[in-house]
Amino acid sequence: MSSTPSTSDTSSESSTSPATIVLCKVCALSAHGSHFGVLACRACAAFFRRTVVLERQKQYKCKKGKNECPVDTAERYQCRLCRYNKCVDLGMTPENVQFNRESASRTRKRKNENSIAQTNSFKLIPRSDNAFLGKPRTIMDISSLSTKIKSVLNGKTYNLDSAAKKMNSLEAAEYALKKWRSQQKTEDKMEKVGELPVRQLFVIFEKQMVMIAEWLIHNPDFRMLDEEEKYLYFKAVWNMWRRFERFEMSVKMFGNQVLTKRKFAISNEKLMVMDSCIDYSEITDLPNSKVAEMFRLTRSKLFHQLAKPLMELNPSSIEMAYMLTQLSWQIAGKKMQGNVIEIGERVCDNLADDLHSYYQKNEKRSNYAGRLVRLMNIVNAMKKIHLQRKNTMELARIFEMFKVDFSDPDIFDC
Protein backbone atom coordinates (compact mmCIF):
# COMPACT_ATOMS: atom_id res chain seq x y z
CA MET A 1 0.00 0.00 0.00
CA SER A 2 1.32 3.38 -0.92
CA SER A 3 0.30 5.08 2.32
CA THR A 4 -1.35 4.42 5.62
CA PRO A 5 -4.08 6.16 7.58
CA SER A 6 -3.10 8.67 10.20
CA THR A 7 -2.42 7.31 13.68
CA SER A 8 -5.30 9.34 15.00
CA ASP A 9 -7.72 7.48 12.75
CA THR A 10 -6.40 4.11 13.81
CA SER A 11 -6.20 4.88 17.49
CA SER A 12 -9.62 6.46 17.61
CA GLU A 13 -11.13 3.30 16.23
CA SER A 14 -9.27 0.89 18.46
CA SER A 15 -9.73 2.92 21.64
CA THR A 16 -13.41 3.65 21.14
CA SER A 17 -15.56 2.25 23.92
CA PRO A 18 -18.75 0.35 23.07
CA ALA A 19 -20.80 3.38 24.09
CA THR A 20 -18.94 5.76 21.79
CA ILE A 21 -20.19 6.21 18.24
CA VAL A 22 -17.47 6.87 15.67
CA LEU A 23 -18.78 8.87 12.72
CA CYS A 24 -18.10 8.49 9.02
CA LYS A 25 -15.98 11.44 7.92
CA VAL A 26 -17.82 11.59 4.62
CA CYS A 27 -21.48 11.60 5.64
CA ALA A 28 -21.41 11.71 9.47
CA LEU A 29 -23.36 8.47 9.91
CA SER A 30 -21.97 5.68 12.10
CA ALA A 31 -18.57 4.57 10.78
CA HIS A 32 -17.68 0.95 10.16
CA GLY A 33 -13.93 1.20 10.02
CA SER A 34 -11.04 2.69 8.07
CA HIS A 35 -11.62 2.23 4.32
CA PHE A 36 -9.15 3.47 1.71
CA GLY A 37 -7.37 5.36 4.48
CA VAL A 38 -10.43 7.21 5.79
CA LEU A 39 -12.80 6.38 8.64
CA ALA A 40 -16.05 5.71 6.80
CA CYS A 41 -19.35 3.85 6.83
CA ARG A 42 -19.93 0.85 4.59
CA ALA A 43 -22.16 2.80 2.22
CA CYS A 44 -19.56 5.48 1.52
CA ALA A 45 -16.80 2.88 1.17
CA ALA A 46 -18.95 0.95 -1.31
CA PHE A 47 -19.81 4.13 -3.19
CA PHE A 48 -16.15 5.11 -3.53
CA ARG A 49 -15.05 1.67 -4.63
CA ARG A 50 -17.78 1.33 -7.27
CA THR A 51 -17.01 4.80 -8.57
CA VAL A 52 -13.29 4.12 -8.98
CA VAL A 53 -13.56 0.59 -10.38
CA LEU A 54 -16.25 1.51 -12.89
CA GLU A 55 -14.73 4.95 -13.56
CA ARG A 56 -18.09 6.59 -12.89
CA GLN A 57 -16.51 9.83 -11.72
CA LYS A 58 -16.13 10.72 -15.41
CA GLN A 59 -19.91 10.57 -15.78
CA TYR A 60 -20.91 12.40 -12.61
CA LYS A 61 -22.24 15.95 -12.82
CA CYS A 62 -22.88 18.29 -9.91
CA LYS A 63 -26.61 18.57 -9.20
CA LYS A 64 -26.40 22.31 -8.61
CA GLY A 65 -23.49 23.01 -10.95
CA LYS A 66 -21.36 24.61 -8.24
CA ASN A 67 -19.39 21.60 -6.90
CA GLU A 68 -20.25 22.56 -3.32
CA CYS A 69 -23.30 20.44 -2.44
CA PRO A 70 -23.54 19.39 1.23
CA VAL A 71 -22.68 15.75 1.94
CA ASP A 72 -24.14 14.71 5.28
CA THR A 73 -26.67 12.35 6.83
CA ALA A 74 -29.51 14.01 4.95
CA GLU A 75 -27.81 14.87 1.66
CA ARG A 76 -25.24 12.15 0.96
CA TYR A 77 -27.27 10.58 -1.85
CA GLN A 78 -28.20 13.85 -3.57
CA CYS A 79 -25.02 14.69 -5.51
CA ARG A 80 -22.68 11.87 -6.45
CA LEU A 81 -19.94 14.14 -7.79
CA CYS A 82 -19.71 16.15 -4.58
CA ARG A 83 -19.82 12.98 -2.52
CA TYR A 84 -16.96 11.50 -4.57
CA ASN A 85 -14.95 14.75 -4.38
CA LYS A 86 -15.35 14.79 -0.60
CA CYS A 87 -14.05 11.21 -0.42
CA VAL A 88 -10.98 12.26 -2.43
CA ASP A 89 -10.47 15.46 -0.41
CA LEU A 90 -10.49 13.41 2.78
CA GLY A 91 -7.71 11.21 1.40
CA MET A 92 -9.43 8.16 -0.07
CA THR A 93 -7.39 6.37 -2.74
CA PRO A 94 -7.82 2.83 -4.11
CA GLU A 95 -4.32 1.91 -2.94
CA ASN A 96 -4.82 3.23 0.58
CA VAL A 97 -6.78 0.40 2.10
CA GLN A 98 -6.85 -0.17 5.82
CA PHE A 99 -9.43 -2.66 7.04
CA ASN A 100 -11.23 -2.46 10.35
CA ARG A 101 -10.19 -4.85 13.06
CA GLU A 102 -12.27 -7.84 13.94
CA SER A 103 -13.65 -8.56 17.35
CA ALA A 104 -12.58 -11.75 19.10
CA SER A 105 -16.05 -13.24 18.60
CA ARG A 106 -15.95 -12.57 14.85
CA THR A 107 -12.45 -14.09 14.66
CA ARG A 108 -13.74 -17.25 16.38
CA LYS A 109 -16.71 -17.32 14.02
CA ARG A 110 -14.39 -16.96 11.02
CA LYS A 111 -12.28 -19.90 12.24
CA ASN A 112 -15.39 -22.04 12.54
CA GLU A 113 -16.62 -21.01 9.11
CA ASN A 114 -13.26 -21.83 7.57
CA SER A 115 -12.90 -25.29 9.10
CA ILE A 116 -13.93 -26.55 5.67
CA ALA A 117 -12.39 -29.82 4.57
CA GLN A 118 -9.26 -29.10 2.55
CA THR A 119 -9.18 -30.57 -0.93
CA ASN A 120 -6.00 -31.51 -2.76
CA SER A 121 -4.03 -28.39 -3.76
CA PHE A 122 -6.80 -25.91 -2.88
CA LYS A 123 -6.23 -24.73 0.72
CA LEU A 124 -8.52 -22.28 2.50
CA ILE A 125 -6.69 -19.76 4.69
CA PRO A 126 -8.56 -17.22 6.87
CA ARG A 127 -7.48 -13.61 6.32
CA SER A 128 -6.47 -11.56 9.34
CA ASP A 129 -8.32 -8.54 7.97
CA ASN A 130 -11.62 -7.82 6.30
CA ALA A 131 -12.06 -7.19 2.62
CA PHE A 132 -13.78 -4.21 1.03
CA LEU A 133 -17.07 -3.24 2.62
CA GLY A 134 -16.16 -5.21 5.75
CA LYS A 135 -17.14 -8.64 4.41
CA PRO A 136 -15.21 -11.59 5.87
CA ARG A 137 -12.82 -13.03 3.28
CA THR A 138 -10.89 -16.25 2.89
CA ILE A 139 -7.81 -16.90 0.77
CA MET A 140 -7.84 -20.00 -1.41
CA ASP A 141 -4.16 -20.88 -1.48
CA ILE A 142 -3.33 -22.63 -4.75
CA SER A 143 0.44 -22.14 -4.55
CA SER A 144 1.17 -25.88 -4.56
CA LEU A 145 -1.03 -26.34 -7.63
CA SER A 146 0.66 -23.38 -9.34
CA THR A 147 4.04 -24.97 -8.64
CA LYS A 148 2.85 -28.28 -10.06
CA ILE A 149 1.54 -26.62 -13.23
CA LYS A 150 4.71 -24.58 -13.73
CA SER A 151 6.80 -27.74 -13.39
CA VAL A 152 4.80 -29.34 -16.19
CA LEU A 153 4.91 -26.25 -18.40
CA ASN A 154 8.68 -25.96 -18.00
CA GLY A 155 9.31 -29.63 -18.78
CA LYS A 156 10.48 -30.57 -15.28
CA THR A 157 7.85 -33.19 -14.42
CA TYR A 158 6.49 -34.21 -17.82
CA ASN A 159 8.42 -35.45 -20.82
CA LEU A 160 7.05 -35.68 -24.34
CA ASP A 161 6.69 -39.13 -25.82
CA SER A 162 9.25 -39.85 -28.51
CA ALA A 163 6.39 -40.42 -30.96
CA ALA A 164 5.01 -36.92 -30.37
CA LYS A 165 8.38 -35.31 -31.07
CA LYS A 166 8.26 -36.59 -34.66
CA MET A 167 4.80 -35.13 -35.39
CA ASN A 168 3.81 -31.76 -36.77
CA SER A 169 2.07 -29.32 -34.41
CA LEU A 170 -1.47 -30.40 -35.29
CA GLU A 171 -0.69 -34.11 -35.06
CA ALA A 172 1.00 -33.59 -31.68
CA ALA A 173 -2.03 -31.64 -30.41
CA GLU A 174 -4.34 -34.46 -31.52
CA TYR A 175 -2.03 -37.07 -29.98
CA ALA A 176 -2.12 -35.34 -26.57
CA LEU A 177 -5.89 -34.81 -26.79
CA LYS A 178 -6.55 -38.49 -27.59
CA LYS A 179 -4.24 -39.53 -24.76
CA TRP A 180 -6.37 -37.52 -22.30
CA ARG A 181 -9.67 -38.65 -23.77
CA SER A 182 -8.69 -42.31 -23.56
CA GLN A 183 -9.50 -41.98 -19.84
CA GLN A 184 -13.12 -40.99 -20.57
CA LYS A 185 -15.59 -43.45 -19.04
CA THR A 186 -18.68 -44.56 -20.92
CA GLU A 187 -22.02 -43.20 -19.73
CA ASP A 188 -23.00 -46.41 -17.92
CA LYS A 189 -19.82 -46.20 -15.81
CA MET A 190 -20.06 -42.49 -14.99
CA GLU A 191 -21.35 -41.15 -11.68
CA LYS A 192 -24.53 -39.12 -12.16
CA VAL A 193 -24.23 -35.99 -10.03
CA GLY A 194 -27.22 -34.52 -8.21
CA GLU A 195 -25.55 -31.74 -6.23
CA LEU A 196 -21.83 -31.12 -6.67
CA PRO A 197 -20.11 -29.25 -3.80
CA VAL A 198 -17.84 -26.55 -5.16
CA ARG A 199 -14.79 -28.05 -3.45
CA GLN A 200 -15.35 -31.25 -5.48
CA LEU A 201 -15.53 -29.07 -8.56
CA PHE A 202 -12.09 -27.74 -7.64
CA VAL A 203 -10.80 -31.33 -7.45
CA ILE A 204 -12.05 -31.86 -11.00
CA PHE A 205 -10.45 -28.60 -12.09
CA GLU A 206 -7.08 -29.51 -10.60
CA LYS A 207 -6.83 -32.74 -12.59
CA GLN A 208 -7.94 -30.97 -15.76
CA MET A 209 -5.53 -28.07 -15.25
CA VAL A 210 -2.54 -30.39 -15.04
CA MET A 211 -3.72 -32.26 -18.13
CA ILE A 212 -4.14 -29.00 -20.09
CA ALA A 213 -0.60 -27.98 -19.13
CA GLU A 214 0.60 -31.33 -20.50
CA TRP A 215 -1.37 -30.74 -23.70
CA LEU A 216 0.10 -27.26 -24.17
CA ILE A 217 3.72 -28.37 -24.10
CA HIS A 218 3.10 -30.61 -27.10
CA ASN A 219 3.15 -27.41 -29.16
CA PRO A 220 6.75 -26.54 -30.13
CA ASP A 221 5.97 -22.82 -30.40
CA PHE A 222 4.53 -22.83 -26.88
CA ARG A 223 7.70 -24.48 -25.59
CA MET A 224 9.71 -21.55 -27.01
CA LEU A 225 7.98 -19.06 -24.67
CA ASP A 226 9.82 -18.09 -21.50
CA GLU A 227 8.67 -19.45 -18.15
CA GLU A 228 6.61 -16.41 -17.19
CA GLU A 229 4.92 -16.28 -20.60
CA LYS A 230 4.02 -19.97 -20.42
CA TYR A 231 2.24 -19.54 -17.11
CA LEU A 232 0.42 -16.37 -18.20
CA TYR A 233 -0.66 -18.18 -21.37
CA PHE A 234 -1.91 -21.15 -19.34
CA LYS A 235 -3.94 -18.92 -17.02
CA ALA A 236 -5.51 -17.16 -19.99
CA VAL A 237 -6.71 -20.30 -21.75
CA TRP A 238 -7.17 -23.26 -19.40
CA ASN A 239 -10.78 -22.61 -18.36
CA MET A 240 -11.91 -21.94 -21.92
CA TRP A 241 -10.06 -25.06 -23.09
CA ARG A 242 -11.64 -27.19 -20.37
CA ARG A 243 -15.14 -25.87 -21.01
CA PHE A 244 -15.00 -26.36 -24.80
CA GLU A 245 -13.36 -29.79 -24.65
CA ARG A 246 -15.89 -31.07 -22.11
CA PHE A 247 -18.81 -29.68 -24.10
CA GLU A 248 -17.65 -31.20 -27.39
CA MET A 249 -17.07 -34.53 -25.65
CA SER A 250 -20.60 -34.33 -24.22
CA VAL A 251 -22.05 -33.74 -27.70
CA LYS A 252 -20.02 -36.65 -29.04
CA MET A 253 -21.23 -38.96 -26.25
CA PHE A 254 -24.86 -37.91 -25.81
CA GLY A 255 -25.88 -36.26 -29.08
CA ASN A 256 -29.20 -34.43 -28.91
CA GLN A 257 -29.58 -35.33 -25.21
CA VAL A 258 -27.14 -32.50 -24.54
CA LEU A 259 -30.08 -30.24 -25.42
CA THR A 260 -33.09 -32.27 -24.31
CA LYS A 261 -31.66 -33.54 -21.00
CA ARG A 262 -28.76 -31.12 -20.54
CA LYS A 263 -26.31 -34.02 -20.25
CA PHE A 264 -22.81 -32.74 -19.60
CA ALA A 265 -19.67 -34.78 -18.95
CA ILE A 266 -18.08 -32.40 -16.46
CA SER A 267 -15.18 -34.83 -16.05
CA ASN A 268 -14.13 -38.24 -17.31
CA GLU A 269 -15.97 -39.78 -14.36
CA LYS A 270 -18.91 -37.48 -13.54
CA LEU A 271 -22.10 -36.68 -15.46
CA MET A 272 -24.41 -33.72 -14.84
CA VAL A 273 -27.97 -33.51 -16.16
CA MET A 274 -30.81 -30.99 -16.23
CA ASP A 275 -31.62 -31.20 -12.51
CA SER A 276 -27.97 -31.26 -11.40
CA CYS A 277 -26.58 -28.23 -9.60
CA ILE A 278 -23.39 -26.95 -8.03
CA ASP A 279 -23.41 -26.02 -4.35
CA TYR A 280 -21.50 -22.73 -4.05
CA SER A 281 -22.24 -22.18 -0.34
CA GLU A 282 -18.60 -22.54 0.71
CA ILE A 283 -17.49 -19.60 -1.42
CA THR A 284 -20.50 -17.25 -1.35
CA ASP A 285 -23.34 -16.16 0.90
CA LEU A 286 -25.67 -15.90 -2.08
CA PRO A 287 -28.23 -18.66 -2.76
CA ASN A 288 -27.13 -21.21 -5.36
CA SER A 289 -30.00 -20.07 -7.57
CA LYS A 290 -28.58 -16.53 -7.71
CA VAL A 291 -25.13 -17.77 -8.70
CA ALA A 292 -26.63 -20.06 -11.34
CA GLU A 293 -28.63 -17.14 -12.72
CA MET A 294 -25.45 -15.09 -13.01
CA PHE A 295 -23.99 -17.68 -15.40
CA ARG A 296 -27.27 -18.64 -17.05
CA LEU A 297 -26.82 -16.60 -20.23
CA THR A 298 -23.35 -17.86 -21.17
CA ARG A 299 -24.28 -21.42 -20.20
CA SER A 300 -27.40 -21.21 -22.36
CA LYS A 301 -25.36 -19.92 -25.29
CA LEU A 302 -22.96 -22.82 -24.90
CA PHE A 303 -25.82 -25.27 -25.34
CA HIS A 304 -27.82 -23.44 -28.00
CA GLN A 305 -25.07 -21.91 -30.14
CA LEU A 306 -22.58 -24.77 -30.13
CA ALA A 307 -24.51 -28.02 -29.68
CA LYS A 308 -26.25 -28.09 -33.06
CA PRO A 309 -23.20 -27.01 -35.13
CA LEU A 310 -21.07 -29.62 -33.36
CA MET A 311 -23.66 -32.34 -33.90
CA GLU A 312 -23.99 -31.48 -37.58
CA LEU A 313 -20.26 -31.19 -38.18
CA ASN A 314 -19.18 -34.11 -35.95
CA PRO A 315 -15.55 -32.97 -35.90
CA SER A 316 -12.79 -35.55 -35.97
CA SER A 317 -10.19 -35.59 -33.21
CA ILE A 318 -7.72 -33.75 -35.43
CA GLU A 319 -10.33 -31.07 -36.20
CA MET A 320 -11.01 -30.72 -32.48
CA ALA A 321 -7.27 -30.35 -31.86
CA TYR A 322 -7.24 -27.69 -34.58
CA MET A 323 -10.07 -25.73 -32.93
CA LEU A 324 -8.54 -25.98 -29.45
CA THR A 325 -5.16 -24.78 -30.71
CA GLN A 326 -6.73 -21.92 -32.67
CA LEU A 327 -8.74 -20.82 -29.64
CA SER A 328 -5.78 -21.05 -27.29
CA TRP A 329 -3.46 -18.87 -29.35
CA GLN A 330 -6.16 -16.33 -30.19
CA ILE A 331 -7.28 -15.90 -26.58
CA ALA A 332 -3.73 -15.88 -25.18
CA GLY A 333 -2.73 -13.35 -27.84
CA LYS A 334 -5.63 -11.05 -26.94
CA LYS A 335 -4.65 -11.26 -23.27
CA MET A 336 -0.86 -11.05 -23.59
CA GLN A 337 -0.38 -9.04 -26.80
CA GLY A 338 3.08 -8.46 -28.32
CA ASN A 339 5.20 -11.52 -28.92
CA VAL A 340 2.37 -13.99 -28.33
CA ILE A 341 0.19 -12.40 -31.02
CA GLU A 342 3.01 -12.68 -33.56
CA ILE A 343 3.76 -16.29 -32.67
CA GLY A 344 0.05 -17.11 -32.65
CA GLU A 345 -0.41 -15.81 -36.18
CA ARG A 346 2.42 -18.03 -37.38
CA VAL A 347 1.04 -21.01 -35.47
CA CYS A 348 -2.41 -20.56 -37.01
CA ASP A 349 -0.89 -20.37 -40.51
CA ASN A 350 1.03 -23.59 -39.87
CA LEU A 351 -2.12 -25.22 -38.49
CA ALA A 352 -3.97 -24.40 -41.70
CA ASP A 353 -1.18 -26.05 -43.71
CA ASP A 354 -1.22 -29.11 -41.45
CA LEU A 355 -5.00 -29.42 -41.72
CA HIS A 356 -4.78 -29.06 -45.51
CA SER A 357 -2.29 -31.95 -45.61
CA TYR A 358 -4.53 -34.04 -43.36
CA TYR A 359 -7.61 -33.49 -45.53
CA GLN A 360 -5.76 -34.36 -48.72
CA LYS A 361 -3.67 -37.30 -47.52
CA ASN A 362 -5.90 -38.90 -44.89
CA GLU A 363 -9.40 -38.10 -46.09
CA LYS A 364 -8.70 -37.58 -49.79
CA ARG A 365 -10.79 -34.43 -49.47
CA SER A 366 -9.89 -31.71 -51.95
CA ASN A 367 -12.89 -29.42 -51.44
CA TYR A 368 -12.97 -28.66 -47.73
CA ALA A 369 -13.47 -24.88 -47.72
CA GLY A 370 -17.07 -25.12 -46.49
CA ARG A 371 -16.09 -27.43 -43.64
CA LEU A 372 -13.27 -25.13 -42.61
CA VAL A 373 -15.68 -22.18 -42.49
CA ARG A 374 -17.96 -24.15 -40.15
CA LEU A 375 -15.02 -25.05 -37.92
CA MET A 376 -14.06 -21.38 -37.63
CA ASN A 377 -17.67 -20.39 -36.93
CA ILE A 378 -17.57 -22.70 -33.91
CA VAL A 379 -14.22 -21.24 -32.85
CA ASN A 380 -15.58 -17.68 -33.07
CA ALA A 381 -18.78 -18.58 -31.19
CA MET A 382 -16.78 -20.19 -28.38
CA LYS A 383 -14.47 -17.19 -28.21
CA LYS A 384 -17.43 -14.82 -27.80
CA ILE A 385 -18.95 -17.00 -25.06
CA HIS A 386 -15.60 -17.07 -23.27
CA LEU A 387 -15.25 -13.28 -23.35
CA GLN A 388 -18.83 -12.80 -22.12
CA ARG A 389 -18.21 -15.14 -19.21
CA LYS A 390 -15.00 -13.28 -18.45
CA ASN A 391 -17.01 -10.04 -18.22
CA THR A 392 -19.52 -11.75 -15.92
CA MET A 393 -16.73 -12.87 -13.59
CA GLU A 394 -15.29 -9.35 -13.55
CA LEU A 395 -18.64 -7.96 -12.41
CA ALA A 396 -18.89 -10.69 -9.77
CA ARG A 397 -15.47 -9.65 -8.51
CA ILE A 398 -16.30 -5.95 -8.48
CA PHE A 399 -19.44 -6.51 -6.41
CA GLU A 400 -17.83 -9.19 -4.23
CA MET A 401 -20.32 -11.94 -4.93
CA PHE A 402 -17.80 -14.50 -3.69
CA LYS A 403 -16.18 -14.49 -0.25
CA VAL A 404 -13.03 -16.29 -1.40
CA ASP A 405 -9.97 -14.71 -3.00
CA PHE A 406 -7.44 -16.88 -4.81
CA SER A 407 -3.76 -16.55 -3.97
CA ASP A 408 -3.26 -16.33 -7.74
CA PRO A 409 -6.04 -13.77 -8.48
CA ASP A 410 -6.50 -14.11 -12.24
CA ILE A 411 -6.44 -17.89 -12.53
CA PHE A 412 -10.25 -18.04 -12.24
CA ASP A 413 -11.18 -14.97 -14.26
CA CYS A 414 -13.73 -16.67 -16.48
Curated annotation (Swiss-Prot):
Residues 21-99 bind DNA. PROSITE patterns: NR_LBD, NUCLEAR_REC_DBD_2. It is found in: Nucleus. The keyword Transferase does not apply. Gene3D superfamilies: Erythroid Transcription Factor GATA-1, subunit A (3.30.50.10), Retinoid X Receptor (1.10.565.10). Pfam families: Hormone_recep, zf-C4. A zinc finger (NR C4-type) spans 24-44, 62-82. Residues 162-414 form the NR LBD domain. CDD domains: NR_DBD_HNF4A (cd06960). GO terms for molecular function: DNA-binding transcription factor activity; RNA polymerase II cis-regulatory region sequence-specific DNA binding; zinc ion binding. Keywords: DNA-binding, Metal-binding, Nucleus, Receptor, Transcription, Transcription regulation, Zinc, Zinc-finger. Belongs to the nuclear hormone receptor family. Orphan nuclear receptor. This is Nuclear hormone receptor family member nhr-213. It comes from Caenorhabditis elegans. The lineage of its organism: Eukaryota, Metazoa, Ecdysozoa, Nematoda, Chromadorea.
